[in-house]
Regions:
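Helix-rich, typically C-terminal accessory recognition domains appended to large enzymatic cores
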Residues: 76, 89-127, 137-217
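Alpha-helical recognition segments enriched in aromatics with Gly/Pro capping
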Residues: 1-88
């Protein structure tokens, strides 16, 4: 593998002894060795397999789902740093980010697209200044995420995605599609708003796929 991810306490072994063993066997060397941090409990105690004080990941995944656990760890803990795990923090992150922010955006958008246009958005458009900031953020997001992921800054990439999610929820409140839907003369404007919402969800789903592959399809 080009990149080896190892615990920070064994970086010396994996950057001196392990490469020497690979060279002796004429096997390819890793191009990068990245030392990740420790997972701690709320009181600062390190989780350790040898101490037998780890949280069972199978139990967590059965209860909350693999994607939710993966999201929590990558969002909550900057890669390379030590991170704290508590059940309270996990539940709060799932409820706040996944259920409230993303879940509500998805629910509201799909419901309005179905209610006003039967699930098929018409081609007519009427743009407004309210659209510009959202469009710019969505347009720039891919490059920002690519840069963060390339540097293994997964938490930063997810933070950028959630900035767009928050801005999109605000956009709904600003444009008030439920008001536009009552005025037939505003149909083109309503179509533009719903299209922008759907386009943001499309972009977000693509960028979240590496983090939540079972959820985004």
């Amino acid at each position: 593998a080009d990149v080896h991810f190892v615990g920070k306490e064994i970086v010396r072994f994996h950057t001196i002894i392990w490469p020497a063993m690979l060279m002796a066997l004429n096997l390819p060397l890793p191009k990068q060795v990245y030392g990740h941090g420790w997972l701690l409990f709320g009181d600062g105690t390190k989780m350790s397999k040898s101490k037998g004080n780890v949280v069972d990941p199978v139990v967590l995944c059965d209860r909350y789902g693999v994607d939710a656990i993966r999201y929590f760890l990558l969002r909550e803990i900057p890669f390379g740093a030590d991170g704290t795990f508590t059940n309270e923090a996990l539940i709060n992150r799932i409820n706040s980010d996944l259920a409230n922010d993303l879940g509500n955006l998805l629910s509201r958008t799909t419901a309005m697209a179905q209610k006003y246009f039967g699930g098929t958005i018409p081609a007519e458009r009427e743009e407004d200044e309210l659209d510009q900031e959202l469009i710019q953020m969505a347009t720039e997001l891919c490059a920002k995420c690519d840069a963060h992921v390339s540097g293994y800054q997964f938490s930063n990439a997810l933070a950028e995605i959630w900035k767009l999610i928050a801005r999109t929820n605000k956009y709904i409140d600003e444009t008030m599609p439920w008001v536009l839907g009552k005025d037939e003369s505003k149909r083109a404007r309503l179509a533009t708003v719903i299209y922008n919402l759907c386009e943001v969800l499309r972009i977000i789903s693509i960028l979240l796929t590496p983090f939540m592959p079972s959820t985004t399809p």
